[in-house]
Curated annotation (Swiss-Prot):
Residues 1-32 are annotated as: Disordered. This is Transcription antitermination protein NusB. It comes from Cupriavidus pinatubonensis (strain JMP 134 / LMG 1197). The keyword ATP-binding does not apply. Keywords: RNA-binding, Transcription, Transcription antitermination, Transcription regulation. Pfam families: NusB (PF01029). Belongs to the NusB family. Gene3D superfamilies: NusB-like (1.10.940.10). Disulfide bonds: none annotated.
Length: 167
């Protein structure tokens, strides 16, 4: 393709070059389950609606068929059932009151905390990275940094042997 020297625009009769944008890799079933669990926890944290109704609604959501439904159910139900225990685990690492966290950050911390405590087959770095990615996607501009810091400190406490072996 030749550009006209005066304008830098494509010469008459030529087509502009097609843009080649890198296509994002498909989301894993576990990533989708985490996204849906975060959305469910967000709804629950805001309204305290019946978790069964929220879960049923999300099971019917577009794209749920591509999620790991067992992992989703475990994350959503486990985080709600153990909210007080999980919050008590990460609360010492907060620089503010739990009530001052955004609902997205709080939901991401609950998902990440649940996985750190109960999903020991998932490496702690993966758990933290997934929570960070959730916060980047659904949260505020800098929230992911906060979630990263809190979960990193929690991982050192609840998975001390794994963290020590990797550092």
């Amino acid at each position: 393709m030749s550009d006209t020297p005066e304008t830098g625009k494509p010469a008459a009769g030529t087509k502009p070059a097609a843009r080649t944008e890198a296509k994002a890799p498909p989301k894993s079933a576990r990533r989708r389950s985490r996204e849906l669990a975060l959305q469910g926890l967000y709804q629950w944290l805001l309204n305290r609606n019946d978790i069964g109704a929220i879960q049923a609604h999300l099971h019917d959501a577009q794209g749920f068929n591509k999620a790991d439904s067992e992992h989703f159910d475990a994350l959503l139900n486990g985080a709600v059932r153990e909210e007080a225990r999980l919050t008590a685990a990460f609360e010492p690492f907060l620089d503010r009151k739990v009530e001052e966290l955004s609902p997205v950050e709080r939901a991401a911390l609950l998902v990440g905390s649940y996985e750190l405590v109960h999903c020991v087959d998932i490496p702690y770095k993966v758990v933290i990275n997934e929570a960070v990615e959730l916060t980047k996607t659904f949260g505020g501009v800098e929230g992911y940094k906060y979630v990263n810091g809190v979960l990193d400190k929690l991982a050192a406490q609840v998975r001390s042997a794994e963290v020590a072996a990797r550092r």
